[in-house]
Amino acid sequence: SYIAVAQGGQIFSNGTSSKPVVFTSEKGTPGSWGGIVLCGKAPINKAKSATAEVSELTYGGDVATDNSGTITYTRIEYAGAIFNNKKEFNGLSLFGVGNGTKIEYVQLYAGSDDGIEFFGGTVNTKYIVSNENEDDQFDWTEGWVGTNEYWYGKEGRNKGNRGIEADNNDSNNNLTPFSNPIIKNVTLIGLGKDYVGEGENQAIKLRQGTKGQLENFVLANWAKGIDIEHDVTLGWTSKDLLVKNVQFINVNTESSGKTSAGAAVDVTKFYSKANNTGAGNGVDTPTWAKGWTVGL
């Protein structure tokens, strides 16, 4: 089971800090149900329109301001069910969603795949908690260009892959519009700098041509902080791709890079270090996330 909103449809899930809306499962285990899927009419780089990998609904178009509704003070728990033998749901999957949509104060908790994933679109977000999801806490691809503030991501359950996985397009890294989000004030916490288990234990993976302006990040308890791959991504200047003011705490390797052919390269030009508060309280739970979330 899952909830899907087709193009032209809208969802209104509006809780409060004391009474959040909760989408959950009686089983209380990751992958118990599919999660929430929104399909909008905003631009993507896969084609003018495409079929969503989960739900098989159409998404994409040329309406940057498309409105798929409002999700505020909402928890999505234990999502990530298998859709077919190749694809799993995320907690919240945003396919070509426009910036007329409001997504603020949302938690993605204990899913079996990613917490939240953006497939193109222009949607913006604020105050997002993504924790204990078993793959990536945050993920984007297919030309997403949203503006975002205050993300708090935390691995858990002895599983997890990356805090952020960022792509432009896996079949052609040069497709436009390029993924190019603005993201400020973020804390990403891993399972430990010496953790050995499932996943790559990376805070941020930037690859397949993505751009982005990331600012004020705290990366704590990871084997690797920032990893950048593929020639198109590595060809950007700091005006196109930059992690500005990043603080590394208990991170074994701050950064690494690899060309499309697999050769190691230095990527220090893509980030600058500085002490900052990340999502609000450094590694601690931010004040804005208290009272309506779980598992922190």
Q: How does the language model describe each region?
A:
Residues S1-I3:
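Classical protein tyrosine phosphatase
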Residues V5-G8, G15, T24-D113, E117-E134, ...:
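Extracellular beta-rich repeat passengers
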Residues K19:
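A phosphate-binding glycine/aspartate-rich beta-alpha loop in the early core of alpha/beta enzymes
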